[in-house]
Amino acid sequence: MPPLSESEFLALASKALDQLEAAIEAAADAADADVEINRTGNVMELEFEDGSKIIVNSQAPMQELWVAAKAGGFHFRNDGSKWVDTRGGGELYAALSGYMSQQAGVTLTLK
């Protein structure tokens, strides 16, 4: 996918974070898991019952979404249809489902 202008990327990232927030709420409700979601602009903080956190934020200069979790730090770039890990090639929702499940202690599946 060719580079986007900063405003195009910010719109794409904002939409992705909106969709991700809704998917996380649905997954937490379905699993009866306690996941607190706090969002300020381009930063989403997920806090779990044990006090651990996952941070998801957009990085306009790199045109990436960054995820910081207990499992490590990960960068995702949009390929035109989905957000893909720049190192491992995994898809954002699948990867984040795993990170969240690890930290929540229950299976959480983002759809």
UniProtKB/Swiss-Prot annotation:
Pfam families: Frataxin_Cyay. PANTHER family: FRATAXIN, FRATAXIN, MITOCHONDRIAL. InterPro entries: CyaY, Frataxin/CyaY, Frataxin/CyaY_sf, Frataxin_CS. GO terms for biological process: iron-sulfur cluster assembly. The keyword Signal does not apply. It comes from the Bacteria. GO terms for cellular component: cytosol. Belongs to the frataxin family. NCBIfam families: FeS_CyaY. The gene is cyaY. GO terms for molecular function: ferric iron binding; ferrous iron binding. Keywords: Iron, Metal-binding. Involved in iron-sulfur (Fe-S) cluster assembly. May act as a regulator of Fe-S biogenesis. This is Iron-sulfur cluster assembly protein CyaY.
